[in-house]
């Protein structure tokens, strides 16, 4: 480790101990050296004994900085790793940090634009940031060419070395988890960290975020439910993104929404519809839909529209995952637990040799109590959570796309019920899911598939006679090759039979000669002739095998 890494590790250890996080070390024989070492560091006592463990963990991560804050946010969605009281505290982590110098941001913008002054491209550039987070911060300006209001997102300077240094330490900690926890290997800590690192590195590439925003805007063009600001891609680079400035009410500001007369029921239902449309219609969903990234337009409060920003994290599901997920939801709400178990096996989410009866019973045991509540109070996110946690006991592999989906669904549900506590997610989502499944099977799906593939077959039609001729010729050649191989195999079997016969004769002659040589030494030449004959016969048999 470098001196810098050692200093950083010391700071992390001191922070963890000052918040009493040594409580997380399990009391096992293998951890005894760690617990002894902890006692030796007596000058680092727990200074927050009045707080619960979950709160102390959250405060420690906030003190350690942006990389650890985002790591905690990601862990809050993995409720199979932590008890609810810790996961709930991690979900409260806020990605808010002090802004860096506006002059430095201006310099970065100029570097991204080819060392040309900001004033060449933009008017009214505000040196004071509009918002600041751990990865980037945002400044306002106007496009010089048309005067449109824009925001410029700039990556923090020198953030990459900080991320790489902290990720090294997180990887070191992850390697210890399987050794320290009895269930550590099943939790796949290295996969969790790799997933987090990929998400973090993706957020550093604003060209990727620009492309995501453009795609999402195209998917919801002229939609009454969601507006995505325009991206000015000519000005975008890996470290800078320029997009239309929007004005709206933060979705978490319930008072402001009510004061302008917003139809809260419709707004909450549209949030659910937007989510399911992204997942099932588009196979492309905004996976960071926390309240800080969602606004509501000031226009037409009786017919409200969402505004979505910050498309750094997106998810997608393939066709099979979408179908299995939709059928899982419907089977669950129909209490068809056998179907749920079979779908998990058919999808490959659990191994094919899983005992379906045992799996069905486990799902029933965990999920049946949920129906003690009214349907309007049942959480889709927690349904998924319960299903996946049960499936993990049957060796379900971690599915990163489903983890993202679960996190996003929990956000959507939380926002929806904050807007309209009586929101019935199942009533809102069921027609959409049933319509989507109906569209994926039967005659409509067959017709659509034919239409999609018709241009390909029309293009290949002239080649079909030649392909048929080639197929017949190859079939004939293949038959000749098979006949030749069959003859060779038969010949080999005959030779092997002859070889075994000759080996037997040769061995018999050699053994007879040896016995005569021992018992009748007066028969001078006979043993020698027998042994020589046996050797010759044995050699002939050996050559037959060549």
Curated annotation (Swiss-Prot):
Belongs to the ABC1 family. UbiB subfamily. Its main location: membrane. Residues 124-502 form the Protein kinase domain. Pathway: Cofactor biosynthesis; ubiquinone biosynthesis [regulation]. Is probably a protein kinase regulator of UbiI activity which is involved in aerobic coenzyme Q (ubiquinone) biosynthesis. ATP binds at residues 130-138, 153. It comes from Enterobacter sp. (strain 638). This is Probable protein kinase UbiB.
């Amino acid at each position: 480790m470098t001196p810098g890494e050692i200093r950083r590790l010391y700071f992390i250890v001191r922070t963890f101990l000052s918040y009493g996080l040594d409580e997380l070390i399990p009391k096992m024989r293998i951890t005894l050296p760690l617990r002894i070492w902890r006692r030796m560091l007596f000058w680092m006592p727990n200074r927050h004994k009045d707080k619960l463990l979950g709160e102390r963990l959250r405060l420690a991560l906030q003190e350690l900085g942006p990389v650890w804050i985002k790591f905690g946010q990601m862990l809050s969605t993995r409720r199979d790793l932590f008890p609810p009281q810790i996961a709930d505290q991690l979900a409260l982590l806020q990605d808010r940090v002090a802004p860096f110098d506006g002059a430095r941001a201006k310099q970065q913008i100029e570097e991204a634009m080819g060392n040309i002054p900001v004033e060449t491209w933009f008017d009214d550039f505000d040196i004071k940031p509009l918002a600041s987070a751990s990865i980037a911060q945002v400044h306002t300006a106007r496009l010089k060419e048309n005067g449109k209001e824009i925001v410029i997102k700039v990556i923090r300077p020198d953030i990459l070395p900080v991320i790489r240094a902290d990720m090294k330490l997180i990887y070191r900690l992850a390697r210890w988890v399987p050794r320290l926890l009895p269930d550590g290997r099943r939790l796949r800590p290295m996969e969790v960290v790799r997933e987090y690192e990929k998400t973090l590195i993706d957020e550093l590439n604003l060209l990727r975020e620009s492309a995501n925003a453009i795609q999402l805007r195209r998917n919801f063009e002229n939609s009454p439910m969601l507006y995505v600001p325009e991206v000015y891609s000519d000005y975008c680079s890996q470290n800078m993104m320029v997009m239309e400035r929007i004005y709206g009410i933060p979705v978490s500001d319930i008072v402001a929404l009510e004061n302008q007369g917003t139809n809260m029921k419709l707004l909450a239902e549209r949030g659910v519809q937007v989510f399911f449309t992204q997942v099932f219609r588009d196979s492309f969903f905004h996976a960071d839909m926390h309240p800080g990234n969602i606004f509501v337009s000031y226009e037409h409060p009786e017919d409200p529209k969402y505004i979505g920003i910050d498309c750094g994290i997106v998810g997608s599901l393939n066709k099979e995952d979408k179908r299995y997920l939709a059928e899982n939801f419907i089977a669950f709400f129909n209490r068809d637990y056998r179907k749920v178990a079979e779908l998990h096996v058919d999808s490959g989410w659990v191994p094919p040799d899983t005992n379906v009866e045992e799996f069905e019973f486990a799902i029933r045991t965990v999920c049946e109590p949920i129906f003690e509540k009214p349907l309007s109070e049942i959480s889709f996110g927690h349904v998924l959570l319960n299903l996946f946690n049960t499936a993990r006991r049957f060796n379900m592999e971690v599915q990163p796309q489903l983890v993202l989906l679960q996190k996003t669904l929990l956000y959507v549900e939380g926002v929806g019920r904050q807007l309209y506590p009586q929101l019935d997610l199942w009533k809102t989502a069921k027609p959409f899911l049933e319509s989507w499944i109906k569209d994926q099977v039967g005659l409509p799906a067959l017709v659509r598939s034919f239409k999609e593939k018709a241009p390909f077959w029309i293009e290949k039609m002239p080649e079909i006679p030649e392909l048929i001729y080639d197929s017949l010729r190859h079939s004939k050649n293949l038959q000749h090759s098979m006949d030749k191989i069959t003859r060779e195999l038969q010949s080999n079997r005959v030779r092997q039979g002859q070889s075994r016969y000759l080996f037997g004769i040769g061995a018999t002659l050699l053994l007879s000669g040896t016995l005569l040589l021992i018992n009748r030494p007066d028969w001078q030449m006979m043993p020698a002739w027998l042994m020589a004959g046996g050797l010759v016969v044995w050699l002939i048999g050996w050559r037959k095998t060549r």
